[in-house]
Amino acid sequence: MGIGNLERFVADYHNKNAARRDLADVGAEYSENAENSGKSVKRYLGKAAVIGSGPAGLACAGDLAKAGCDVTIFEALHVAGGVLMYGIPEFRLPKEIVRQEVENLLRLGVKIETNMVIGKTLSIAELKDEYGFDAVFIGTGAGLPRFMNIEGEALKGVYSANEFLTRANLMKAAF
């Protein structure tokens, strides 16, 4: 049996049996129903902005929320998850797993703003000065491709790997 299958079993088992219980205990002050029950979610540290919702952004947001920060993720695209959602094919990483991870962050109190291109929609200075963020984590990933400057790379129908995967995964484009 391959190690990947064992890792998948453990992750699936954890998600089905332990994840909700663990999230309810985070920080002793946060309960999954705090916002719905009218209780305030207490935060002990400052307010943090996370730019990008790929693997680094999601991990950072989760760790900061567990430590007591008020965290908001700013994602440029319309779907949270970054390369996990648009760059990895479904057969390698089911999108439902990524959606579950994003949902876990929401239960931790993390807020997610999609369609927010920091640098165009808002600047980092505005995040700090006008919105009161104490810290900003920039986890924007590898969004821009490096071209090889070879003949034909600018022709119609020639895509970078990132553009191809984005078109196939988010836009459901047929090639």
Protein language model regions, located:
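Nucleotide donor/acceptor-binding cores
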Residues: G46
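Beta1-alpha1 glycine-rich phosphate/pyrophosphate-binding loop at the start
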Residues: V50-K120, R146-E153, E163
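Short hydrophobic core segments
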Residues: I51, F74, G132-G141
